[in-house]
Amino acid sequence: MIWQEKIDAALDARRVADALRRRYPVAQGAGRWLVADDCQYLNFSSNDYLGLSHHPQIIRAWQQGADQFGVGSGGSGHVSGYSVAHQVLEEELAEWLGYSRALLFISGFAANQAVIAAMMAKEDRIVADRLSHASLLEAASLSPSPLRRFAHNDVTHLARLLASPCPGQQLVVTEGVFSMDGDSAPLEEIQQVTQQHDGWLMVDDAHGTGVIGEQGRGSCWLQKVKPELLVVTFGKGFGVSGAAVLCSNTVADYLLQFARHLIYSTSMPPAQAQALRASLAVIRSDEGDARREKLAALITRFRAGVQDLPFTLAGSCSAIQPLIVGDNSRALQLAEKLRQQGCWVTAIRPPTVPAGTARLRLTLTAAHEMQDIDRLLEVLHGNG
């Protein structure tokens, strides 16, 4: 098979399965409204959970940072790209989340890949939740360490895997809030079992940080758990982009030496770090509390109104509210019908989710109003 035949065959297979992904150019894609093709939609596909992407204080911080530092960092943090803005943000994140150190990354995907690649050797073992994010599972599959996957949130299965002989170290990998189902990991039980087998715990809390817990400190804080490695991202609750790894002093020093994604990538712009500092200030403030309370009320309203629809509603109390449809083509048809009625909803299909679990992945944000939820429910009931 030549290259073009290989590519064509892969694309054809996706088309036949109604699994071909598309991008839609939007004029506005975050916040309450999405604008595409000169049409305005209620936006139920955004990760901007607290509605901070358009916060004037955060926008102003980025603008002022660009005036002060320019629009780029100018290099890797190991060369010339680590500014005082990066340093102060790392210190503020570490203090907020109760860790000795924080290291900034350009994305959550890069952070997860970097940590696993740097930490793991062939004699070690990775034990990951089966529904962990693609960045975690891909990093684990590319690692020289063997990967074992435990059934979703099944601590008993995890314990059995950890109990089997391993010549090296064991790293347990999970998420705080799972990106496709919106449910939470039983972190306290997972950490207890991990410690019983002398392992370390790595938690990706992309969808919890800023959104849940006291001052938005996330899933681990809420469950009174402190993993050895905590990954937080800034494209969700913070409304910006980027990520950080929270860890001990010695682990931070180790990653600075061996995490290639950190060493060989240009740092995020200092202006972005300034915007993230402003976002963190909002998240920790009374305004942040009010936004989280509003989001919780919107979630409650949605779940109460969707119970009698002929779809499977995932057991999620988070901003991620999936409606499991099952069939790929049915999910696509429903998403299109909702868009025709003014609600922008995304159909998620395999391989992103397991076969037979195609879904409408609805996300609610603090930028929404109660009437938006009521409109969504009205449209869903009309198409159920």
From Swiss-Prot:
Key words, A-Z: Biotin biosynthesis, Pyridoxal phosphate, Transferase
Annotated function: Catalyzes the decarboxylative condensation of pimeloyl-[acyl-carrier protein] and L-alanine to produce 8-amino-7-oxononanoate (AON), [acyl-carrier protein], and carbon dioxide.
Gene Ontology BP terms: biotin biosynthetic process
Residues recorded as bearing N6-(pyridoxal phosphate)lysine in the entry: 236
Pathway: Cofactor biosynthesis; biotin biosynthesis
Annotated residues for binding of substrate: 21, 133, 352
Protein family according to the UniProt entry: Belongs to the class-II pyridoxal-phosphate-dependent aminotransferase family. BioF subfamily.
Enzyme Commission designation: 2.3.1.47
Origin: domain of life: Bacteria
Complex and partners: Homodimer.
Protein name per the record: 8-amino-7-oxononanoate synthase
Catalytic reaction equation(s): 6-carboxyhexanoyl-[ACP] + L-alanine + H(+) = (8S)-8-amino-7-oxononanoate + holo-[ACP] + CO2
Main enzyme class: transferase
Gene: bioF
GO molecular function: 8-amino-7-oxononanoate synthase activity; pyridoxal phosphate binding
